[in-house]
Amino acid sequence: MEQGMNDMQGNMMNSNMEETMMPYYNYTGYTTYDGHFTQDYDFVRALKYDNVMIDGYKVNTATNDKDVSTSKKVNDTMVDMNKDGQVVNITFDTKADTVSKAMFKEAHMSNHMSDEGQTENGSYMTYETNNGMYTAHFDEQGYLMKVMIS
């Protein structure tokens, strides 16, 4: 009986430990070097959990002030901040003609797509995250051009 109780406590501890481990992804460098990281399973899961860091910056999805006050370019990434210096958007370019819309859609199918449409020079797909969203922009040939996390 005592062994069963220890097993149960051990399973509960393991369960609690698994719940606290949130997926994360940290990208440092030029995002235009190789756009395939946008297809990485860990990147997709980290997006869902609002836990992606690009060049040392991560969107603060908890802030209520989403108004952009300043912007900072780091490598080929644009970081938008509110008046308090909290990151509200991160936009990064990707390598041209590398990731097709179909490839992106397949890699991100575990996340909820909330919008899809056309732009003047291509198309876009917007996905919901736990507390925010991200939008992928595609050129007229259907290749990923940039991603905006907010």
Regions picked out by a protein language model, each given a short descriptive name:
Residues 1-17:
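Sec-dependent signal peptide cleavage junction
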